[in-house]
UniProtKB/Swiss-Prot annotation:
Organism in which the protein naturally occurs: Thermotoga maritima (strain ATCC 43589 / DSM 3109 / JCM 10099 / NBRC 100826 / MSB8)
Keywords associated with the record: Cell inner membrane, Cell membrane, Membrane, Transmembrane, Transmembrane helix, Transport
Subcellular location: Cell inner membrane
Pfam families: ABC-3
Alphabetized InterPro entries for the sequence: ABC_BtuC-like (IPR037294), ABC_TroCD (IPR001626)
Lineage of producing organism: Bacteria, Thermotogati, Thermotogota, Thermotogae, Thermotogales
Its job: Part of an ATP-driven transport system TM_0123/TM_0124/TM_0125 for a metal.
Name recorded for this polypeptide: Probable metal transport system membrane protein TM_0125
Amino acid sequence: MDQRNKTLRDLPWEGERLSFFHDLVEYSFLRTAFVGGILVASLSGLVSPIVVFRRMEFIGDGTAHAVFAGLAAATLIGADHRLIAFATALLFAFAVSLFSRSRISESSAIGILLPFFMAVGVVLFSVSGRYQTDVMGYLFGDVLLVNSTDVAITAVVLALSVILTVVFRWDIKYFIVDEKMARFYGIKTDLIRFLITSFIAITVVTTVKVVGVILTGALLILPGLVSKIFGKSFWSLTTISVIFSTGVFFAGFLTAYTLDLPPGPVIVIIAFVSFLPMLKFS
């Protein structure tokens, strides 16, 4: 049984591969994977500055690992992966919030829950009998998992996220800077926190298919860090983050196509390497 991570070579090519742009026009499955990836990168770029400025990097990474349990549960019972994964992500966020109300810090709560959800995922995958075939794809991403339905759903989610960000832009900015002051000025901080948590959960669920559970944290953090270095306003932060995220996806996808490498890890490597020179401007 083939347990290696999938590369673009594993796609169902019907003829000889020519050039990236030629094949992008020629093969619908390649276009689907590419467009889906661009949408996912745009969504993660939109959320990333909020994650970075609110110092929610750990909860973003923890949510990605929690989603693994949801994917395993969906595989076991034959349910829709997106719905179960999203529900699991929200359950994780709720559990972290519940633990944090006691004397346990948020980071400690995440540290407790993250391995628990991962362990549950491994057990459920083992029970389902599909441990070897599905786990690598979910851990490191699998371009073959992206389909037209994913693209349509991601497009709708991205559009709604943009609309909500525009509508609640002032509330989000105040919430990011000082939650207590935002509450003092009458901003519904619980609603904003729920929206942000939902953004993170949805972004994680969509991003997992492209780069996997383990690597999702990179796309939730690196674009926001880049925007923090160069951005001067809320909109410039968001714009820079989205441009960086989509840019590294394009570069990673093109490199993976050229060298027959798994796209997810290549995208994250390029994102990290691209970020390093920018540190001198910080």
